[in-house]
Amino acid sequence: MNKNVLKFVSRSLLIFSMTGLISNYNSSNVLAKGNVEEHSLINNGQVVTSNTKCNLAKDNSSDIDKNIYGLSYDPRKILSYNGEQVENFVPAEGFENPDKFIVVKREKKSISDSTADISIIDSINDRTYPGAIQLANRNLMENKPDIISCERKPITISVDLPGMAEDGKKVVNSPTYSSVNSAINSILDTWNSKYSSKYTIPTRMSYSDTMVYSQSQLSAAVGCNFKALNKALNIDFDSIFKGEKKVMLLAYKQIFYTVSVDPPNRPSDLFGDSVTFDELALKGINNNNPPAYVSNVAYGRTIYVKLETTSKSSHVKAAFKALINNQDISSNAEYKDILNQSSFTATVLGGGAQEHNKIITKDFDEIRNIIKNNSVYSPQNPGYPISYTTTFLKDNSIASVNNKTEYIETTATEYTNGKIVLDHSGAYVAQFQVTWDEVSYDEKGNEIVEHKAWEGNNRDRTAHFNTEIYLKGNARNISVKIRECTGLAWEWWRTIVDVKNIPLAKERTFYIWGTTLYPKTSIETKM
């Protein structure tokens, strides 16, 4: 290799080295100036700075706001649930027992209910905590909500315990179930240590009752999916439909405190900077599944009480109401008979009792004691999440659940067999005429009316005559006509008793006595 070539190579290496040094110097100089612009990532040869990050976050937030504001749905319909549609049913049936006739009648009814207060029955606390983001859809109505899990921005929660002021608030930086729950417990600990000795908590209580006819009717009435709770209460809907049992359900809600979330100014305020709307769309957000967040949760306890009876009386509801209101029913034989055929089941959610703690008794005073005891919050009697409210993220409007369902209202009525007694001791010839209708039902539930007459009608009877006519419990339109022979040419037969459409009684006796010109009558009834 000659000297010229070696000189050329040496000069080239020197030029490359100097170029590298200059480049490194420029880069260092940029970074020195760049206390404002630090490297965060390199993508395709481009340096992405914190300003770029900020721009990306703004773009993500704007995109989330634009798309959520742009969702098209009817808030009245998105959480609208149409339950059972009743088509074919037998409207009436009749059954004979040894001393009674039982009529079971069924009538189609409907119930509509709109509520923003969604009852919590099952252990779904990790999906219904304050600040949780849910999809407003059928699953939410059925108490099994879908939640959106993603990076979140901080939220502020507050507990409405008295006297706490700023101590009753807390910022949750990453609002997951565990972190929100921890923040709530921290606020409660502060209350227990600093405020509980100074303030008392007024328990807010609500009460509702409903006669039970079907599962969908009951879900609409109490504002929750009732399947889970029925595992504890064991309501026999089949026996109710057949008319073999009658059931009333009571719901006592005792709210100790409520945890609320400060509402966001815009939808993106709930999502982390790196979250995109495309990611949210993949998690299910669309026109049919708009996002909502849990804006508040009520903590306390709920007591559900089942009152069940085998009585066929038409006054079951009134008897139960009298019992609930602690009225004196000692003089009401029918109410006492109904309650003697009744039993009571209570299940308690929350408070010092374990979840679904179940009590079965025939003494309603035991139920009253359960309601009365453990009705105030304390560390030993903690609150259980019993209901929550969801709010649409689009406009911060309340997400109300609208239930509508058809159901069959079944009423079973017992009609006890009875009898008519005819007693004639008068000094004349008498004739009796007794007629009635017997009601039954065909296989389609159509009423069949059969006219009946006593076989001894219109025969001459002299004193002393006494007979008993036995009537089934399905006897209706009972008529009794009695006439006596006067011996007068112009009025040979005189009607002395003529009663129509009298109700069936356990025993009704018709007495006649006296003379041809001065007959006497009386009617005695034993119900």
From Swiss-Prot:
Family annotation (InterPro entries): Thiol_cytolys_C, Thiol_cytolys_C_sf, Thiol_cytolysin, Thiol_cytolysin_ab_sf, Thiol_cytolysin_sf
In its keyword annotation, does this UniProt entry include Signal? yes
TM region positions:
215-228, 235-244, 313-322, 330-342
Source superkingdom: Bacteria
Gene Ontology biological-process annotations: killing of cells of another organism
Keywords, sorted A to Z: Cytolysis, Hemolysis, Host cell membrane, Host membrane, Lipid-binding, Membrane, Secreted, Signal, Toxin, Transmembrane, Transmembrane beta strand, Virulence
Q: Where in the cell is it found?
A: Secreted; Host cell membrane
- PTM comment text: Purified 48 and 53 kDa proteins with 4 different pIs (6.1, 5.6, 5.3 and 6.6) in decreasing order of activity.
Single GO cellular component annotation? host cell plasma membrane
Where does the record locate the signal sequence feature? 1-32
Free-text activity regulation comment from the record: Cytolysis of host cells is inhibited by cholesterol.
GO MF annotation list? cholesterol binding; toxin activity
Locus of motif Conserved undecapeptide? 484-494
Residue window of motif Cholesterol binding: 516-517
One Pfam family, short name please?
Answer: Thiol_cytolysin
Major site of localization recorded for this protein: secreted
Gene3D superfamilies per the UniProt record, alphabetical:
3.30.1040.20, Perfringolysin (3.40.30.40), Perfringolysin, domain 4 (2.60.40.1430), Thiol-activated cytolysin superfamily/Thiol-activated cytolysin, alpha-beta domain (3.90.840.10)
What does the record note on quaternary structure?
Homooligomeric pore complex containing 35-50 subunits; when inserted in the host membrane.
Say which family it is in.
Belongs to the cholesterol-dependent cytolysin family.
Q: What is this protein called?
A: Tetanolysin
